[in-house]
A protein has these predicted regions:
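Class I SAM-dependent methyltransferase Rossmann-like catalytic core
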Residues: 4-40
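Conserved class I S-adenosyl-L-methionine
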Residues: 42-51
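Conserved SAM-binding loop of SAM-dependent methyltransferases across substrates and taxa
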Residues: 52-65
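Conserved SAM-binding motif I beta-strand of class I
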Residues: 68-73
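S-adenosyl-L-methionine
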Residues: 78-108
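A short glycine-rich, Lys/Arg-flanked "PGG" loop and its adjoining helix->strand segment in the class I
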Residues: 129-141
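Conserved beta-strand signature within the Rossmann-like core of class I S-adenosyl-L-methionine
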Residues: 139-149
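Class I S-adenosyl-L-methionine
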Residues: 157-196
Length: 196
């Protein structure tokens, strides 16, 4: 079994538009991205693009057996690895655009938190729109959405377009501090209250 970095790099070389990174995210980035997960209650937490599971581990630690954790991964080898590694997580090999349908199949109508590891800056405009439509329509009115961007992507037109789209789709968008202990360094976007 290859280690996570080897698997990640191999899948990146195979499908760079859906992986978007050459290595798994660090624990520091995972902690920053997963900050909105509530400490109490039975939240429905959706994770998009979990890859090899650095955010998954953080989400599981924060949930401590509460709620429902749905992880949606489009890459089949990574979905298999994730399901084997985290048996308590509801891992599904599917496209994130099917989020509403995936929640409904489980009797879950809305997500309280959506954590995204998707490579938004690598996506064309139409895909950014359709995926964010799926996300916002699946969220409860007070829900939180977090995602991240690598600092080298800041000047890209696709990254600027995505930031504008976040501001259009959410009442509140707050950029977090740069997480330097990640390869490459990244910063987090915290968005709340989807406009549907």
């Amino acid at each position: 079994m290859p280690n996570d970095t080897t698997l990640f790099l191999g899948q990146f070389l195979r499908t760079p538009a859906t992986i978007g990174a050459v290595a798994p995210s660090s624990r520091q980035l995972a902690a920053a991205v997963c900050a909105p997960i509530p400490e109490r209650g039975e939240p429905t937490v959706v994770e998009l693009g979990p890859g090899t599971g650095p955010f998954t581990a953080e989400i599981q630690q924060r949930l401590g057996g509460r709620g429902h954790h749905l992880a949606v991964e489009v890459n089949e080898p990574m979905a298999r690895l994730l399901a084997a590694r985290f048996p308590a997580v509801d891992v599904v090999h599917a496209d994130a655009a099917r989020l509403g349908e995936l929640l409904a199949e489980r009797g879950l109508w809305q997500a309280d938190v959506v954590v995204s590891g998707l490579p938004w800056a690598a996506f064309p405009q139409r895909l950014q729109h359709s995926l964010l439509d799926a996300v916002t329509s699946a969220m409860s009115p007070g829900a939180a959405f977090t995602t991240f961007s690598y600092i080298h992507a800041i000047p890209l037109s696709s990254a600027r377009r995505f930031r504008a789209l976040l501001a259009e789709r959410f009442e509140e968008v707050v950029p977090g501090r740069t997480v330097w202990r990640n390869t490459p360094p990244a910063f987090v976007f915290h968005a709340r209250r989807p406009r549907t």
